[in-house]
C-alpha cells in the first residue's frame, strides 16, 4: 500500500510540474544535461515562425483559380504525379482554373520520393514553360518538386548543387525572386505546404538531402481535408507515422535558445530552429490526435535513399520505395530510447499521451517506456518488423551511418549529440522491433 501511495504522489508531482510553464525559457530540463556552446560560438536567442499563408476548409480547393486570377497569373504550371492526375483533387483544380480563365500546362511526371534526376526533369519543364505561377497538387514529393522547379526556373544560370544543402551542395542563399506557388496537399504529415524545404534522394551518394530556404516556401497552402478521402489505407498510415515522429522530434528537440551558432543576420536563421513555446503546443496537440485517431520522418533519410527492392503496399510506383513516414517510424523506438536521458520528463509526457501508464514510472525509465509504447503502437498497426523486414541487414549499417552524417541540419537539433558509433548502434537496434 505504501509503495502505491508513493507512486501516486510521484505521479501527481510530475503532473504539477507539467502544469507549470514548460517553455524553454523557463524550463530547466536541459540545463544540467548540456554543456556550453562550442568555443567561439554563441547560442541563439530567438525563433521565427516563417511559414506560408494557410487556408483550411472542406472544398477550399475550388478557390485556387480565383487565387491565381487575383495574383495576375497568365501562364500556370500544374504539377502532380501520374496517379493523382487521374483522381478528383487534380480534376477539381483544373476545373477551377478553366472556370477562371487561367491558361495552364500539366506536368504529371513527379516521382514519389523524388531524386536529383527527377527534380532536374521538372526543372527543365519549368524553364521551357516560362510560367508566371505554379500549383502543386499532391503529397510532399509533388510540393518539393514544384518548389525546386520554381527556384531553378527563376535562377536559370545556377548549377543544381548551388542551392543544395552543404556539405553535399554549396548551400548558397537564394537571392532571386520566385514566382507564386500554391500548394494543394493531398496527404497529411509532410507539412511541405508550410516550409521552405525541398527533399530529394541524391543518387550519387545514395542519401536524402535537400534545399532549405524561406524563399522557396509556397505563397499559399490550400488545406482541403476532402482530399484525404482518396488516400489508400497504407498511405494514410504512413502519413500518420510522419505526424507521430515529427511531433515527437519537435517536442523533444534541443530548445531554440541552446542551438548554435546564433545567426549574424536574421535572414540566415535556419528552417529547423529547435523546440519553442509555439511549436510545443502544436506538437502535443498532434500527438493527442495521433493517439486518438491513428489506429482507427534524420535517420530516415539514408533508409529511404538506400532502399533496395522494397515496395510499400498501396504505392503505385515502378521503383523501390520506402515512404518517408515508414522510414522514420522504424527507427523511432531506438532513437527515443537514446535521446531520453537529456529530457526524460518530456519523453515520459509523450509516452503518457500515447497511452502509457506512467504513474509508477521512474525518470531513468523514460526512454524504454516511450520505446515500448511506440512498439505496441506499430505492432497494432501491422508495421514491418524493423529494417530487416524491408530488406536491410547489419552489412548495410556502415552505409546507413555514412548517409546520416551529412544530415546535420536535422541531427544537430537532437537533444543528445551522436557519434558514428552511436548511430551504428541505433541502426542495429532498429533491425528488429518486436
Predicted feature locations:
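Active-site segments that bind and position negatively charged phosphate/pyrophosphate groups
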Residues: 255-373
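Active-site nucleophile and cofactor-binding loops and adjacent substrate-binding regions
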Residues: 110-114, 137-139, 299, 320-325
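Carboxylate- and glycine-rich phosphate/diphosphate-binding segment that chelates Mg2+/Mn2+
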Residues: 195-297
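Generic secondary-structure signature for well-ordered alpha-helical cores
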Residues: 69, 98-103, 124-128, 151-154, ...
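C-terminal charged capping/lid subdomain of soluble metabolic enzymes
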Residues: 5-34, 347-434
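ATP/NTP phosphate-donor binding region
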Residues: 14-133, 387
Amino acid at each position: 500500500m505504501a509503495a502505491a501511495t508513493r507512486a501516486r504522489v510521484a505521479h501527481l508531482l510530475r503532473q504539477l510540474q507539467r502544469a507549470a510553464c514548460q517553455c524553454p525559457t523557463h524550463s530547466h530540463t536541459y540545463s544540467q544535461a548540456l554543456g556550453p556552446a562550442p568555443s567561439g560560438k554563441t547560442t541563439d536567442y530567438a525563433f521565427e515562425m516563417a511559414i506560408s499563408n494557410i487556408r483550411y476548409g472542406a472544398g477550399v480547393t475550388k478557390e485556387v483559380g480565383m487565387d491565381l486570377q487575383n495574383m495576375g497569373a497568365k501562364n500556370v504550371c500544374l504539377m502532380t504525379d501520374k496517379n493523382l492526375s487521374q483522381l478528383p483533387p487534380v480534376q477539381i483544380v483544373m476545373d477551377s482554373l478553366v472556370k477562371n480563365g487561367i491558361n495552364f500546362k500539366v506536368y504529371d511526371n513527379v516521382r514519389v520520393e523524388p531524386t536529383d534526376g527527377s527534380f532536374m526533369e521538372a526543372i527543365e519543364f519549368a524553364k521551357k514553360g516560362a510560367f508566371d505561377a505554379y500549383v502543386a497538387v499532391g503529397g510532399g514529393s509533388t510540393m518539393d518538386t514544384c518548389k525546386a522547379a520554381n527556384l531553378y526556373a527563376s535562377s536559370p544560370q545556377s548549377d543544381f548543387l548551388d542551392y543544395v544543402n552543404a556539405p553535399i551542395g554549396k548551400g548558397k542563399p537564394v537571392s532571386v525572386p520566385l514566382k507564386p506557388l500554391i500548394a494543394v496537399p493531398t496527404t497529411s504529415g509532410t507539412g511541405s505546404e508550410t516550409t521552405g524545404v525541398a527533399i530529394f534522394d541524391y543518387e550519387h551518394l545514395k542519401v536524402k538531402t535537400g534545399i532549405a530556404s524561406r524563399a522557396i516556401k509556397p505563397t499559399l497552402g490550400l488545406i482541403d481535408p476532402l482530399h484525404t478521402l482518396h488516400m489508400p489505407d497504407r498511405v494514410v498510415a504512413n502519413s500518420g507515422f510522419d505526424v507521430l515522429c515529427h511531433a515527437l522530434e519537435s517536442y523533444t528537440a534541443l530548445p531554440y535558445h541552446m542551438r548554435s551558432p546564433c545567426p549574424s543576420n536574421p535572414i540566415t536563421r535556419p528552417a529547423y530552429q529547435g523546440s519553442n513555446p509555439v511549436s510545443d503546443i502544436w506538437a502535443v496537440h498532434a500527438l493527442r490526435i495521433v493517439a486518438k485517431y491513428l489506429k482507427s520522418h534524420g535517420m530516415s533519410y539514408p533508409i529511404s535513399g538506400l532502399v533496395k527492392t522494397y515496395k510499400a503496399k498501396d504505392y503505385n510506383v515502378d521503383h523501390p520505395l520506402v515512404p518517408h513516414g515508414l522510414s522514420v517510424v522504424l527507427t523511432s523506438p531506438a532513437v527515443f530510447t537514446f535521446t531520453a536521458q537529456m529530457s526524460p520528463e518530456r519523453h515520459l509526457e509523450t509516452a503518457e499521451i500515447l497511452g502509457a501508464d506512467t504513474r509508477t514510472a521512474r525518470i531513468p525509465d523514460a526512454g524504454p517506456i516511450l520505446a515500448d509504447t511506440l512498439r505496441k503502437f506499430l505492432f497494432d498497426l501491422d508495421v514491418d518488423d524493423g529494417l530487416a523486414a524491408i530488406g536491410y541487414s547489419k552489412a548495410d549499417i556502415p552505409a546507413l551511418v555514412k548517409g546520416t552524417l551529412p544530415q546535420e541540419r536535422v541531427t544537430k537539433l537532437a537533444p543528445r549529440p551522436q557519434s558514428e558509433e552511436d548511430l551504428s548502434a541505433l541502426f542495429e537496434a532498429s533491425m528488429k522491433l518486436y
